[in-house]
């Protein structure tokens, strides 16, 4: 009672009432909030209030010698009174203006180099074009995006070492600079930053921006490359969007884009080879993107895309634990299941063996143009909430979810036989068979699914079998939402295994990825992709195969010619001749091969008919399995430029043209290299008869000691090798034959062998 009376008395005074009603700070919690702790609670207000004062800045005492007390207008620049609690001087904002105009100048040459990322951003914005603002509902979903355009892809540890080496070279501590990119960057930066006067800490901070990828989990509708993310606040709000075209590209976006294209091409090509995993690794290791080894990029680049992840898995790197189906990334958010094989009958009474997931599970599905939440039980879809950019995208997501649910009505909706094959002509697994079938035509699936009346829920509408929205009815369990489903935010990576058919599994044996999941979308890479592997010659079409095959023969002629004379079968089996076969009509392959092999055998048997150019020209044709026939050809046809073109067995043609004067070969008008030897050597007087019983292997090989005279050869044991002096003082390596039966042919081949070994 006493308290209330006291309060009443206080309230009766007009001053009390005024304080409590007119002033906003009338709550102890608020007073506490603004007065406790060192952290400034309202920086903007504090700044305005400070700047309204005469001397809001404090500076070191030395400033009094460097700045006059008054400026040209007679305004005071600093006060003689000390700053309370320190021995600093109180300074006016006008002093800053004076300093900027009249203070000492320093070299600005390093600024664009240190603040490179900022200067480049200004250029991009200057040249970018902003389009009209449109008001519409924005379906944003959170994605992990790169917020830092123009960076290299170093790990933070690698970057730390580079920064210490460049900015603080005299600091103690071991620094390990191993990767090629680390060394290149360190060298460039040390040169750039010689005599740099900018504070080292600032340099280090800016330098970090150039080296390390920074990602954030942000709501995005539209482009996700870093040059779009840097203007996110300008291009999309809650209910509006502004069209924008960046005024420049940055290397990190180009690397991401080119990496995806290279990985897709490699996975597609590997899938059709005899040993997909070995081929994939061979291609990843021999490919460069923008001059950097693809394997180095894969180790550092966090891009998550099906093909990229398959390549990473093959290299033994960790990848995200989400799995891919029908081009959507699935992440299980709750529930669990066990897998069991089950046989089911399609509407066409075809038997399929599917791995059924038994149990209740919830998933998020994220695709490029649609996202969804899926709740399912054993072979039953309970609920699917979809959102997408347009009708088509929403339909794609619904089909994938319906197939994934493994419901009986979906399997019964199959009309006709399922016999889809992959690029290697192998049948797809049953789940992908079903997916392909309904992706081609989902009419029966949607019609058979069933519809149900729906409740009116905010932000959700129904969708009918013809994919039109409806507020009363909807496909059973399916709703369309205005809100997108966020991408899985975690950056956790898991250990995976990969089999030789490129199927990637987690440690519990669940398939996360397979070549069927790799997109067929073709794009043009921003950076040059150099595939050194012969498996990728086809990627640029038949002409490239032709030129590359001949270039390869010429580059490796030294070893090729020895194999040609000693072990032709091994030579014909080389994978470098594989792509070439696709240029020759199936019907002619065997006949051409038989003809060329016979011709080659005659060259080996008959003295003086050895013709380097002709061997090079015909060699690729001999790689196909030969047919024994008596057919003779004067020209062989290859399919390039959309039609058959002839390669003449004797003589030049537009396809294969050898210029004797320059010793250069052109294939389809493109230079294919130079022959280092004279292809028409005269027959040297070789003591071939004396070399009976010996096999000529190669040029002199110093490891086998000094050259013996021909008489000394007789002391060699069978299978022993030695260098021997022949004819015009040339030295060749020979081996004494293990069998005597082949002695007859030795004298015939010796001439050609010697000639080859000498050259």
From Swiss-Prot:
Gene Ontology CC terms: host cell nucleus; virion component
One Pfam family named in its UniProt record: Flu_PB2_6th
GO biological process: 7-methylguanosine mRNA capping; cap snatching; DNA-templated transcription; symbiont-mediated suppression of host gene expression; symbiont-mediated suppression of host mRNA transcription via inhibition of RNA polymerase II activity; viral RNA genome replication
Main subcellular location: virion
Motif range (Nuclear localization signal): 736-739
Assembly behavior: Influenza RNA polymerase is composed of three subunits: PB1, PB2 and PA. Interacts (via N-terminus) with PB1 (via C-terminus). Interacts with nucleoprotein NP (via N-terminus).
Name recorded for this polypeptide: Polymerase basic protein 2
Species this protein is from: Influenza A virus (strain A/Chicken/Weybridge H7N7) (Influenza A virus (strain A/FPV/Weybridge H7N7))
